C-alpha cells in the first residue's frame, strides 16, 4: 500500500510538472510504450498533442531508448508545413513528455474509410504528401511506414505526416549503402523490402506513396488478400487493377510508382513534372530547423519565454536523458542534426566561447552575426558548390564549469559544412576545446545538475 501511495504521489508530481505548462486532456491514442493525450498550452492557449513515454519500459526493451532519441531527432530535422511539428521535450525521472503539434482533423484514413475521395481531393493530399516526403529525403530521412493512418489533417485540412518511429537516417545504411531492416505495414511495403535483400529507403517510400494514392482514388488497397503469402505474391508481381473511374493521367502516375524494380520507379522530381501532379500545385515553404528567423521562437520554447535574459540556455532534461544512463555522456543531446552537426565541450564560459568562434570565423573569411543568447551565425562571403555555406553555432552551459557547443548546418553544401567543422575551425579553437563529441574525457561531477536542469 505504501509503495502504491508513493507511486501515485510521484504521478501527481509529474502531472503537475506537465500541468505547470500544459493542461492534459483526453487520451488520443495508445501504443506499447507511449500514450498520446490532447493538451493545451497554458501560456498561449494553443492545442497540442503530448506523447507520454515511460522510461522504465523503454529501458527494459533493447534499442528503444535509441529509437526514441532518433525519432525525436528526426522530427526536429524535418520541420515542414506538411509534417507534424515537435514543440519541445520535457522529462521527469520516470517519464518523457514529447509535446507536438495537434492535428485536429484526425487521420486521413478516417476519410478514406467512408469511401474513395474525389480526384481533386486526392490530388491535393498527394501533392502535400510528396512535398513532405521529398523534404524528408532531402534531409536524409526515409519514413518507411507511409500509410493513411500516419497521415493526419489539421483544422484547415492540411496534410501532416506523422509517426517517425521506423524512420531511417544515413548512418543506418550498411556498407552496401542500403537498409536491411524489414519494417512497415505489409500492404504498403515495397517488394524490395519484403525480399530482405537490402533496399533504398527513399525509393521504398515512393512505392508506399503509390499505394496511398491508389487507396485515395479507389477506396481500397491495390494488394490485398486474407493470406499474407498470396498478398506478397501480388506485391512481388505488381499485380493489381485500376478501376475505370480513375483518370488516365492519375492511372499513369500510379503505374510509374508501383514498379517492382526500384531503379525504374519514378522519382520525386519526375512526379512533380507530371501533368496530373502539377495541376494547382503550390510548393509549401519549409522551415529550417536552425534558421536564424526561428531563434527567438526556439528560445521561447526552451527558455520559458524570458526574452529579456541574455544568459546561456540550459538544457532540458530530455536533451541529456541523463536518468536513463550513468556518467556524463553528451552524445545523445545533439542528434537533431545527425551528420549536419558537430559538438564539443569546453570549460570556458559561453561568452568566451562565442567570442572565440566569432574571431575564428572572421579569420576564415566568414561574416559573423550574433543571435539571441549565445548564438552565432557564420556565413561564407562567396558561393560554394550549393550556394553560400551558413553555419549556426550555439553554446549551452550544462553546468557551472562545462559549456557545450553545437554547430548546425544552416545553408549551403553539406560536404563543405563537414569540412568546415572537421578541418577548418578546429585549429583555431584548440585552446578552448575540452573534448569533441565522441571523446570520453574524465568529466567533473555534474550528474545531478544535468538530471535536474531546466529552462533558465
From Swiss-Prot:
Tell me where in this chain the NAF domain is found.
Answer: 309-335
Q: Tell me the InterPro entries matching this sequence.
A: Kinase-like_dom_sf, NAF/FISL_domain, NAF_dom, Prot_kinase_dom, Protein_kinase_ATP_BS, Ser/Thr_kinase_AS
Residues at the catalytic site: 145 (proton acceptor)
Q: Which keywords describe this protein according to UniProt?
A: ATP-binding, Kinase, Manganese, Nucleotide-binding, Serine/threonine-protein kinase, Transferase
According to its UniProt record, which cofactors does this protein need?
Answer: Mn(2+)
Kindly summarize what the UniProt induction comment says about this protein's expression: By salt stress and abscisic acid (ABA).
Q: Where is this region: PPI?
A: 339-368
* Pfam families noted in UniProt: NAF (PF03822), Pkinase (PF00069)
**Annotated ATP binding sites:** 28-36, 51
| Family, as annotated | Belongs to the protein kinase superfamily. CAMK Ser/Thr protein kinase family. SNF1 subfamily.
Q: Which PANTHER family match?
A: CALCIUM/CALMODULIN-DEPENDENT PROTEIN KINASE KINASE-RELATED (PTHR43895), CBL-INTERACTING SERINE_THREONINE-PROTEIN KINASE 25 (PTHR43895:SF162)
Q: What is known of its domains?
A: The activation loop within the kinase domain is the target of phosphorylation/activation by upstream protein kinases. The PPI motif mediates the interaction with the ABI (abscisic acid-insensitive) phosphatases.
> What's the protein called, per UniProt?
CBL-interacting protein kinase 16
Task: Write the lineage as a comma-separated list.
Answer: Eukaryota, Viridiplantae, Streptophyta, Embryophyta, Tracheophyta
